[in-house]
Amino acid sequence: AGWGEAWRPWGARRSQVVSGRGGARTFVTATEGNHGRGVAWAARLLGHKSVFYMPKGSSMERLENIRAQGAYAEITDQNYDGAVRLADQMAKQNGWILVQDTAWPGYEEIPAWIMQGYTTIAQEIFGQLKENNLQMPTHLFLQAGVGSFAGAMLGSFAARLGKDCPVTCIVEPDKADCLYRSARSGTITPVTGDMDSMMAGLCC
């Protein structure tokens, strides 16, 4: 099946989740800023409510950007993983919809939708390269974050270019190097403690 056929059931399910049928819904997520601002904007646009839990060290500017969309947002005393657990707990307690780009067993559908959204960035890159008669890049440098952006981008390039996929480097703060540690150990390895980095939005 082509992209259109594969996309159809996902699109129908997404429509059910975000539709206004049954009244306003409440979406909740953990965020360090960018993801949350987008969710807050979409919730406001569609007439829904949104709640955000931000990890300690998040900037006041990002907090206020989210609140400016009419959302409830607070900076917690948790690191990013702790904020995710809090958002998940509050979703279960209150019947809210968790919109998280971090996946775990039993919570994979919505993160997959978010990754599908990220693939539009790759499609824009392909389109602009073709429009300007430019060659495909030889190297990709991608932020790690929680892995969804990097996975979506690398997957898009690998699916399109196959063996000609660019050499790819995934970059993360040295205080939040869980992907690096996991790759070295061969098993999922969390990072605990304070994640002090000038790239606070990537300390997840």
Residue ranges and their predicted role:
Residues 1-27, 109-130:
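Glycine-rich oxoanion-binding loops at beta->alpha junctions
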Residues 10-29, 37-90, 179-190:
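Active-site-proximal loop->helix
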Residues 27-33, 142-146, 172:
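Active-site nucleophile and cofactor-binding loops and adjacent substrate-binding regions
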Residues 33-35, 43, 66, 125, ...:
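Buried hydrophobic positions in well-ordered alpha/beta secondary-structure cores of metabolic enzymes
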Residues 48-62, 139, 160-175:
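Short, acidic/small-residue loops that bind anionic groups at enzyme active sites
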Residues 51, 74, 97-99, 141, ...:
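Hydrophobic/aromatic beta-strand patches that form the interior of the parallel beta-sheet core
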Residues 81-88, 95-107, 159-204:
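Active-site/ligand-binding loops adjacent to catalytic centers
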Residues 97-161:
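Active-site/ligand-binding-proximal alpha/beta "capping" segment
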